[in-house]
Swiss-Prot record:
InterPro entries per UniProt: H/ACA_rnp_Nop10 (IPR007264), H/ACA_rnp_Nop10_sf (IPR036756)
Compartments where found: Nucleus, Nucleolus
Record's protein name: H/ACA ribonucleoprotein complex subunit NOP10
Major localisation: nucleus
Organism: Debaryomyces hansenii (strain ATCC 36239 / CBS 767 / BCRC 21394 / JCM 1990 / NBRC 0083 / IGC 2968) (Yeast)
Length: 58
């Protein structure tokens, strides 16, 4: 089982091990994507994060 999350009514993450909530909403994975040294789009991602003022890890 993997750790999953959904956003609560206050906007904070609510963690669960289920794939769906009791309301039938699909949860999202709480784990980051795998790292690949052959990442073709890292330059574009870094540029977009700088443009919109996001942290590099978001």
């Amino acid at each position: 089982m993997h750790l999953m999350y959904t956003l609560g009514p206050d906007g904070k993450r609510v963690y669960t091990l289920n794939k769906t909530t009791s309301d039938g909403e699909i949860t999202k994975s709480a784990h980051p994507a795998r790292f690949s040294p052959d990442d073709k789009y890292s330059r574009q991602r870094v540029t977009l994060k700088k443009r919109f003022g996001l942290l590099p890890t978001q």
